[in-house]
Amino acid sequence: MPVAEEFQASWADEVEIDQGVLPPPSEVVENGLKIVTEYKYDNDNKKVKIVRTYKIEKRVVSKSIAKRKTWSKFGDSASDKPGPNPATTNVAEDVFMQFITSKEESQRPDDGELDGLKPPSSNVIFKCRTCQGDHLTLYCPFKHTQIAQAKTAEAAKAAEAKVAASNKYIPPSSAGRIPGRDQPPVSREDVTAIRISNLSNFAVEADIDDLVKGFGPVHKLYLAKEKSTGHCKGFAYVHFKFRADAAKAIQSLNGHGYDHLILNVEWSKPPQNN
């Protein structure tokens, strides 16, 4: 009886058979690291070994997060192990979200309502009629000085010229007054105010206070400063409580050397009443 010949496959067939089987993935956990090894074919139909190393960290999370990790997976991931599957899950950076309820959205003011609260123009500033500064005329620091006096004299002359041209009778009590305004009374501060000039550009209010506090109580002190730099303009006004103290300050400080400069101290000239 003839013996059947043993079949021997060629090496090419063996290669094709080997390509159809891939080693199973392996997972090793040691020294706080999880090493996952997988095999697959690339685009050139070559077997590729992929090794992923994960660092295991233990964190304290809330109960809701811990409970969510125990949920059973479903669909194509029903047979996956606990935790993210690298084949289907990509771990990226944390994204923080802020949820706004409909109630908060309804309470948010519209842009149209805010437009009415905005100033009409960012270039609009206050302009003083006395010194042309960026403040209200009512709060002008020069309203009792020579600048205000010159402004008042010019306004009075303009009013007199207007009255002379109209040929109307003007009561003596109203003669020389600015139309629409009453004549301001003489302030008690005017007779106790002194003007200190030729000050250093680096002088501050504390320096002026040190100069005059030895002569008597001071009611008000003003140091003129540059708007852009904040440096002293070279002069200041001091209002004493008593005129006798102001006179002593003028006598002592006028011609006095201070900060390598000679001070000029005189009475502050209030506006004259017409």
Swiss-Prot record:
InterPro entries: eIF3_g (IPR017334), eIF3g_N (IPR024675), eIF3G_RRM (IPR034240), Nucleotide-bd_a/b_plait_sf (IPR012677), RBD_domain_sf (IPR035979), RRM_dom (IPR000504). GO terms for biological process: formation of cytoplasmic translation initiation complex. It comes from the Eukaryota. Its main location: cytoplasm. One of its GO terms (molecular function) is translation initiation factor activity. GO terms for cellular component: eukaryotic 43S preinitiation complex; eukaryotic 48S preinitiation complex; eukaryotic translation initiation factor 3 complex. The keyword Transcription does not apply. Residues 192-270 form the RRM domain. It is found in: Cytoplasm. The keyword DNA-binding does not apply. Pfam families: eIF3g, RRM_1. Keywords: Cytoplasm, Initiation factor, Protein biosynthesis, RNA-binding. Component of the eukaryotic translation initiation factor 3 (eIF-3) complex. Belongs to the eIF-3 subunit G family. RNA-binding component of the eukaryotic translation initiation factor 3 (eIF-3) complex, which is involved in protein synthesis of a specialized repertoire of mRNAs and, together with other initiation factors, stimulates binding of mRNA and methionyl-tRNAi to the 40S ribosome. The eIF-3 complex specifically targets and initiates translation of a subset of mRNAs involved in cell proliferation. This subunit can bind 18S rRNA. This is Eukaryotic translation initiation factor 3 subunit G. It comes from Bombyx mori (Silk moth). The gene is eIF3-S4.
